[in-house]
Amino acid sequence: MAEHGHNMWEEEPSKGRDSLDSDSSASTTSLVFDQISERVAAESGTTKGKRMRYGHDEADLGARLSELDDEDPLKDEASGDYDLETGPFLGGHGHNSNHDGLSAASGSAGKTQGGYRMMDRGLRRVLIIASLVFVTAWVGGLFIYISHKSYLHGSEFEHDPQATVSRGSLRKITREQVDNGFWRPVKASIAWVAGPAGEDGLLLETNASGASDKAYLTVQDVRSLQQGLDASTEAAVAAARRTLVEKSTFTFAGKTYRIGSSKASKDMSKVLLGVDVQSNWRHSSTAAYFILEVATQTVQPLIPGEVSARVQLAQWSPQSDAIAFTRDNNLYFRQVVAGSSSSAEDADSVIKQITTDGGPELFYGVPDWVYEEEVLGGASATWWSPDGRYIAFLRTNETGVPEYPVQYFLHRPSGAAPAEGEENYPEVRQIKYPKAGAHNPVVDLQFFDVGRGDSFSVAVSGEFADENRLITTVLWAGAQKVLVKETNRVSTVMRVVVVDVAARSGQAVRTVDVGAIDGGWFEISQRTRFIPADPARQRPDDGYIDTIVHNNGDHLAYFSPPENPEPIMLTAGPDWEVDDAPAAVDLERNLVYFLATIQGITQRHLYSVRLLDGGGLSPLTNTSEPGFYGASFSAGVGAGYVLLEYGGPNIPWQKVMNTPAAAAAAAAGSADVSKQMPFVHVLEDNHELAERARQYALPLLVRGTFDVKGHDEGVGAGKLNYLERRPPHFDPSKKYPVLFQQYSGPGSQEVTHEFSVDFQSYVAASLGYVVVTVDPRGTGFAGRSNRVVVRGRLGVVESHDHIAAAQHWASLPYIDGDRLAIWGWSYGGFTTLKTLEQDAGRTFRYGIAVAPVTDWRFYDSVYTERYMDTPQANAVGYDTGAVTNASALAQNVRFLIMHGIADDNVHLQNSLALLDRLDIEGVSNYDVHVFPDSDHSIYFHNGRQIVYDKLENWLINAFNGEWLKIDNAKPQGKR
């Protein structure tokens, strides 16, 4: 092609072809027919040597055939030699002995000329006609070949996630690449921080690599990322730059410590350093803490005289002069005075113990297991007031919560040495774990008055009983008021309470019974945002932004003052929802930023809207193309900068930009917002990943929806989103097996426009199977009516939808309906087994369940009862949702279960209960693999690697028909 500098009739050298055979044969054939073409051209008076063009006048060529009958097209005029195989141009000049032999042998078969056998005229005519037909076809094929850029190697094309045909011969992706992060997009991490005076656009930079030419912890102006700043900007950037911690190690009392975590005070004069950090549950950990003075780079222990004290949580006060921390489940207050002594004698003068009865069953300021996992989503249950006068904290009483034993056979997470003679016994960790219907922890909110030194709680009339209360949100709404959101234990009724801490009183300002509205539940969110009063900016009262149920979806509402139960709706839908909103609030310009599904539920774009009236909805991202974006905003009051993350469908990238200009450009209708920014810095473009995507054969992706019929229990028809991954060299005339991968949990989403090369991609691209992901009803972002249909019957609707999906794909001409498998992890493992049970071998043949729930009575109360109510109130729903029909599972060809023995989340009890039921019923068409000492993630001693090794090999055997052979095994010779 012209853009490559080649004449369209010259073949480009192949780049990295798997085989050169086709090129060689094509070249040889073309040279043969070039000779024929030259003769035709010569007889026609055209320039000798010019190649035949596609579309020549075939009638003219036909008229010349009779004149060519008497000529041998392979004769070399200079030598007079002939070779019917190769012709003289390939050096195949005839040898007289051969020709003589041929002539003698042929005898009367034809006339000879100059000692050579003459070809029969009729035969020559047939050969020439056939040759010209072949030439025409060959030239036509060459035209198509070049016009489609088939001469280019696949790696010369950009990766196209929307491609539906192969890009040619490329390298195969490998399991090792998927496992080791080769295909994982690089993501830079920015820790935004507000300056001491609320300055915007500052970030904390941690030298995690330990490079000797960089300080360990520094503060930078985000504009320092960009080159070529003007003098005034450079001066401002330099003024903002400061070093907080010089080195990644420090020495105290002759011992050197390596920093494991760091938390700077608000005024940036001190840093809290954690060393010897030890993980506890998903979010929590313990560490020994030191306080570093930035000016002198000197340290002192958090607890004077106790350098190695294990602390669960430590938080700076907003005034940077105190730290609240929890140790052994008790809450403490520590004054931080510059130059104070680190001796044990000074401990009493700087530390005050706020609570004294904390212990194994009573937690202060930190959550227990279920609150960490299901409610707060973090390790802190401590909240400082903005002026540092009060500390709000949760008291969690687990006295009535039953224990579950987690066994560790190969290591001892506690670090404690066993008693002599007990070395060969497992370590058992007893966890207070409330299962569905069991006693919940009793949680109440308490306050500590720093000035008065006393603790207190505030009773509010109409509150839920202790056993029926979940405190889901605690938010300071100014210096003296706290906004508290609480629900009943089954999450159908929510109360919003405003506590006046100074007056030690409170009132319920809003109560919503969503169960009565749509039969659903409240999802827990920690994104509620306080909006301070600012009369100069038309905000006469304090307020808050919350996500509420509106127009069949999750939408943003602005309540001001906080006691006002009637909000200003900032978003309304009705055919879209917000996601984990708000992302940020610009208090200087009264703008609210959020991610939403306006362009489709598989996409996320960033938008802004006016705070005061909900008007002026504007995109900050390019909505003309599919995209899945994320956003992290700067911590200043103006939220003036954003780390914008493009996650797909093309190669992911990250840019830092300033938001006011972005909003203005979007409002002006700019087609490419990013190019209109006064400040735009590409933080990561993933160019290496883009190059890999060009060089490797990635699966072909097909996204869409398909119709699903209504369920017989009052669930109407609907549309389900799917993602189909096809092999790179997909051939619709073939029959492919299908692996269905899913999660399916309430409110979750698997089918998106994100870029991903994962295990599913490997199965499609390198094993050659079709892999399909479907989001059934109950999953997220398709409207409340789509979600709440699973309430009270988890697994029933989801399995119905997956069976419908399997039936749909089985009906497609390129699918082998006898080779369908489904797999999933956690909730996906549950859905796998429930689908196999409900289908009973009619559609699916195989399944793999990793760490599955098998009976919702075994899972934690907060999560389960939100969707199922209690077992006492919904016994039928729990019975229906449990995987218990062993005879139905026996109808499948085979299934595989894998589980970690030390799973503290989905207990091994789930798999054991099912195995027992299978034993009772005499069912044996399954395999089991357990992982000692592995938790829900299955990492211990190479566990994660083995999970996917097992999954891959087991699946190959399934689709190869190996499990059919062992269904009725017989000794050799007895068949």
Curated annotation (Swiss-Prot):
**Transmembrane parts of this sequence:** 126-146
How does the record classify its membrane topology? Single-pass type II membrane protein
The EC code for this enzyme is 3.4.14.5
Parts of the chain on the Cytoplasmic side:
1-125
- Give the keywords, sorted: Aminopeptidase, Glycoprotein, Hydrolase, Membrane, Protease, Serine protease, Signal-anchor, Transmembrane, Transmembrane helix, Vacuole
Gene Ontology cellular component annotations, sorted alphabetically: fungal-type vacuole membrane; plasma membrane
**SUPFAM superfamilies xrefs:** alpha/beta-Hydrolases, DPP6 N-terminal domain-like
Ranges for the region named Disordered are 1-111
A single GO BP: proteolysis
Q: Which residues are glycosylated?
A: 207, 397, 622, 885
Highest taxon, organism lineage: Eukaryota
List where Acidic residues composition bias occurs.
Answer: 68-84
The catalytic residues are 826, 903, 936
Instruction: State the reactions this protein catalyses.
Output: Release of an N-terminal dipeptide, Xaa-Yaa-|-Zaa-, from a polypeptide, preferentially when Yaa is Pro, provided Zaa is neither Pro nor hydroxyproline
Pfam entry (one): Peptidase_S9
Biased composition range(s): Low complexity: 22-31
Q: Which GO terms describe its molecular function?
A: aminopeptidase activity; dipeptidyl-peptidase activity; serine-type peptidase activity
Give me the Vacuolar side stretches, as residue ranges: 147-975
Recorded family membership: Belongs to the peptidase S9B family.
- The protein here is known as Probable dipeptidyl-aminopeptidase B
